[in-house]
Amino acid sequence: MNPTCKKRMGAIRLETMKVVAQEAIAPAIFELVLEGEMVEAMRAGQFLHLRVPDDAHLLRRPISISSIDKVKKQCHLIYRIEGAGTAIFSTLSQGDTLDVMGPQGNGFDLSDLDNQSQVLLVGGGIGVPPLLEVAKELHARGVKVVTVLGFANKDAVILETDLTQYGQVFVTTDDGSYGIKGNVSVVINDLDSQFDAVYSCGAPGMMKYINQRFYDHPRAYLSLESRMACGMGACDACVLKVPESETVSQRVCEDGPVFRTGTVVL
């Protein structure tokens, strides 16, 4: 057995979680509510590795956590149907169960931020959900939250109303069918504010822009999406290169999914 895999297996948490509810919130995008003891260990920016309840699909699917309720022991996951596995997830309803591994990943660093702090959240498409818990937790501390969201079109817009509870929200669409026409850079490049921290998640093009725009920022973070196989750091399916190194690499599942800008090659 790979020694990395063996090391991780002792720390993996597996649980059969109960489906509390599920609904479609946009075309091919669903919000799934799960309940279980694992919720107590969850942090903003982490993800769960879900087993498809079908013997034909062996690999788990990584789904980011959008919000956490430790009192109810419930978490919300928002995902897009990308293939047969996630299509099966969309058929689940109240009372069903899921085999869950997690919580996985490092999550966002929300330390040392208070009512004197101002943060920028940047999300695109299905990368928006992980930012909801960040906004909720920081708003509760009195942190000023500014959010910029990017979508392909009006039909793809999600979580705008939810995020507006926690601060100012700008929405952009590629075709101009809703909000500001263009991508998130149209808004961000015009913002005069200095931000104590930046948290982002989205498509590769957006992440490259954030990485360049805030390259030297001491607290700018990228939550990266990647295809995964084992989810334990053993298979090297989600490896990223490190700047100025031919030998050192980072794994999205184990070392991420959150990385500080300038620390990985995009």
Regions found by a protein language model. Name each.
Residues 13, 249-266:
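Short, basic/aromatic-enriched C-terminal tail that caps enzymatic domains
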Residues 21, 67, 171-173, 222-224, ...:
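Structural signal for conserved beta-strand scaffold positions within catalytic alpha/beta enzyme cores
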Residues 204-205, 225-257:
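Local cysteine-cluster metal-coordination motifs and their immediate loop/turn environment
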Residues 2-96:
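Ferredoxin-reductase
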Residues 84-227:
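FNR/FR-type flavoprotein reductase catalytic core
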